[in-house]
Every structure is written in structure tokens, then in C-alpha cells.
Amino acid sequence: MNKEQFLEKIKGGIIVSCQALPGEPLYSENGGVMPLMAKAAEQAGAVAIRANSVRDIKEIQKAVSLPIIGIIKKDYLPQKSFITATMKEIDELVATSCEVIALDCTLRERHDGLTINQFIKKIKEKYPTQLLMADCSNFKECENAYSAGVDFVGTTLSGYTEESKKQDEPDFELLEKLVEAKIPVIAEGRIHSPEQAQYVQKIGVDGMVIGGAITRPLEIASCFVQAVESVEKL
């Protein structure tokens, strides 16, 4: 699948993030949970899946026929980048044949000592046809990553780094700026409701990822519990 085909596939649709990390209720040492989430997403009309880890990606590929944005989350402390942070993770993801690989493209110090531009260059030299999505937190990072050779940028890390503004809703301002700059953008982060998804779509993004509002029942249930408990009893 090339860049144009992927963009056409996700246009006007929802990419569902199906992830669970150790310590979370839906995480299982034996696997088997995320492909069920992906199957439900496909039946609902999702156009693609975002998944973490080689195991989950392979299981999801067997369960659905949707393209996958693959990542591997691994800490390399004391550095803060943990989403597909080194070539080791890139190699492992390429071996799964996932359509897109997403990686941290912030300008923070990296574990491998490379700048993000050098890292992107090495990936493109090694895997020239592999589609890349840049997980970024602000416009400068997005602009830099796109000029360095990634295929799409994502607002995945907006609000989660020291270099971005903390907020409870999607970063509409950043999305608008990226669309205006004609940088292919996949909206991601804090899209909590269908109304917010509609607003994001109207901005003109190329695609959007929704995770917590769909595939994290702990967060969803907590939201309802807090709302009900905040109401004063008659």
C-alpha cells in the first residue's frame, strides 16, 4: 500500500487504537484481547487500526483485513522518547508488514544519540517504501518531521510533552495550522466524543485516531462514575 492508497483508505473514517499496556485491565500475557477489539472496530466501520507490539499486530492481522499503524512502546530511560524509539523497533515492525509505522518525532534527546532527522534518514535508506507517521506534540516538530521525509504527521503527543500545551480537548489549533500548511495530518489525542470527532473532520484532516473513548473501558467507566457521583442527591 502506497501513501496515496493509504490516505484514500482512511479519508473520512476512523482509525481505532487498540492497545493495552502491562498493568491495565485489558492487558493479557497470553494475548488474544486486542484482536477482539480490532474485530469490533472493523464491524463498526473503522478504516484502520493502530496497534502496539509485534504480538498484537500479528494477532490483529489474522482477525481483520484493515491496514495497521504499528508502534512499539519501550522505555529507554532517562530519555523520554518511547514510541518506536530505535532502529531495533523499526526492524521488528517492518517484519510484521504493517502498512504504517509510527514513531516519536519530537525534538527531544534520543537514546541512540541521533537527531530525529538523522533517524528518519536512516529508516528511509534502509526501508525506502515503508510508510512513516510522525508522532509529534507541536507544529515545529510536525514541520520538521515532514521536511525530513515522513509521510504523515500525527498530533499524538500534543499535551503530553513539556514542549506542548496541556489541555483536555483535541489540539484544534494545531490541527488547523497543519491543514493550512498542507502537511498530511492524522489527528490523534483526546477525541472523547462524536461531536469532537465531527469538529476535527470539518477542519479537514486526512484521518483521525480514536483510542481511549472506544477501547479503554476503565477510562470510559470512570467518566460515567465521576459524572454520576458529582450530582447532588435530591
Curated annotation (Swiss-Prot):
Disulfide bonds: none annotated. One of its GO terms (cellular component) is cytosol. Pathway: Amino-sugar metabolism; N-acetylneuraminate degradation; D-fructose 6-phosphate from N-acetylneuraminate: step 3/5. This is Putative N-acetylmannosamine-6-phosphate 2-epimerase. Coiled coil: none annotated. The gene is nanE. One of its GO terms (molecular function) is N-acylglucosamine-6-phosphate 2-epimerase activity. It catalyses: an N-acyl-D-glucosamine 6-phosphate = an N-acyl-D-mannosamine 6-phosphate. Keywords: Carbohydrate metabolism, Isomerase. It comes from the Bacteria.
